[in-house]
């Protein structure tokens, strides 16, 4: 049985954890607030946890060699995007990061933003359980359009929230519309825009969403 109170409590705990991680990383002076040229109304702000520029590099990331090689290849590919596009070679721009909490998914987004010198917009999909569920599609569309204009990296945190709520009877129709909106937005963004989704519950995500990603990277805890 779905318990809204329990989910809110879990959600609050996860947000506090993200904020603590962010504070720790900010204390290193490697993140700076980035002011967006917003093309959305104030309600869409509720979905955004951070907009930053980063000076994190691959040297800051603790991960397995396989994961490191995947990130390094992606970075090199993105650095040569213009040449690849001229040769009609498709360029990866959508990454799904999955693994347990604390394995470095958010830090990985900071690293990619730093290596590629892109602003990073962190979007909190967990807020779709809010009372304004009906406005989710519109707000996400506004944020994505802003990301395209800013040539930003978008991190969709708590990506499994889409799957968690889709399976419950309440608001089923609206959640289906939100999932369809995400699918359409994935197709809408140009190759200049990079989308990263993070989840610790891969099994909760719709297969149609998973198939939209160019890369799916499994991340483990540093000591595993």
Walk through the language-model features, giving the residues of each:
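Flexible nucleotide-interacting loop at or near the entrance of a catalytic core
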Residues: 47, 51-56, 60, 76-81, ...
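Walker A/P-loop NTP-binding motif of AAA+ ATPase domains
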Residues: 66-70, 76-224
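Interdomain "pre-motor" coupling segment immediately N-terminal to P-loop NTPase/helicase cores
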Residues: 2-57
């Amino acid at each position: 049985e779905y318990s809204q109170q329990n989910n809110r409590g879990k959600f609050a705990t996860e947000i506090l954890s993200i904020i603590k991680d962010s504070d720790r990383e900010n204390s290193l002076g490697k993140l700076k607030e980035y002011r967006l040229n917003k093309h959305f109304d104030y309600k869409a702000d509720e979905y955004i946890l951070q907009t930053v520029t980063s000076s994190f590099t691959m040297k800051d990331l603790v991960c397995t060699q396989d994961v490191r090689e995947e990130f390094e290849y992606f970075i090199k590919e993105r650095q040569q995007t213009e040449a690849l596009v001229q040769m009609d070679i498709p360029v990866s721009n959508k990454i799904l990061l999955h693994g347990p909490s604390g394995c470095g998914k958010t830090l990985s987004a900071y690293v990619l933003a730093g290596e590629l010198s892109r602003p990073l917009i962190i979007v909190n999909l967990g807020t779709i359980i809010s009372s304004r569920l009906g406005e989710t599609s519109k707000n996400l569309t506004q944020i994505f359009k802003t990301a395209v204009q800013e040539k930003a990296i978008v991190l969709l945190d708590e990506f499994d929230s889409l799957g968690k709520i889709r399976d419950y009877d309440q608001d089923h129709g609206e959640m289906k519309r939100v999932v369809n909106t995400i699918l359409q937005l994935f197709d809408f963004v140009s190759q200049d825009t990079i989308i990263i989704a993070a989840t610790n519950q891969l099994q909760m995500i719709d297969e149609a969403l998973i198939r939209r990603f160019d890369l799916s990277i499994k991340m483990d805890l540093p000591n595993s």
